[in-house]
Amino acid sequence: MKNITDSFVSLGHWSSAGSFGFNTDILATNPINLSVVLGVLIFFGKGVLSDLLDNRKQRILNTIRNSEELRGGAIEQLEKARARLRKVEIEADQFRVNGYSEIEREKLNLINSTYKTLEQLENYKNETIHFEQQRAINQVRQRVFQQALQGALGTLNSCLTNELHLRTISANIGMFGAMKEITN
């Protein structure tokens, strides 16, 4: 294992003029490093992302099915309300002959309340679908970000030597000192 690590370290010390090799300096990225990181992210993240999306899809489909069942119940209630409306209309015609207008108001109230109930159920269904979609998108984003961060940390930890670590700290301290002098 040490020989493999030494061979990668020695690749980083080759002259860059006219040569081709891995750049082990994490601060000087190149297309090879970027393609390796992207390849690793795609390779390892594809399965997890696919499973996550499938689970989300099933939850959304279940929510849609539940909403459709609620819609079916609302339609059934609407049919009952229509039957009741027909009955009320017949009674209204009988009472209208006698001069009663109270039945007409009850009919309108019944229609309005039924339509309001249907609108509320439709709005609830749409809000539920939208909420589940947003939640799925946010979870996928969070999962992808976590995987990218873990991959980047893994790459950093595997490429970071003590010497490089000390040089990075020294450079950051120097930049901090320069910033402090500028602000004073």
Swiss-Prot record:
Keyword Plastid: yes
Name by which UniProt lists this protein: ATP synthase subunit b, chloroplastic
Taxonomy, superkingdom: Eukaryota
A GO CC term assigned to this protein in UniProt: proton-transporting ATP synthase complex
Organism lineage string: Eukaryota, Viridiplantae, Streptophyta, Embryophyta, Tracheophyta
Membrane topology type: Single-pass membrane protein
HAMAP family on file: ATP_synth_b_bprime
TM regions (residue ranges): 27-49
Additional information: In plastids the F-type ATPase is also known as CF(1)CF(0).
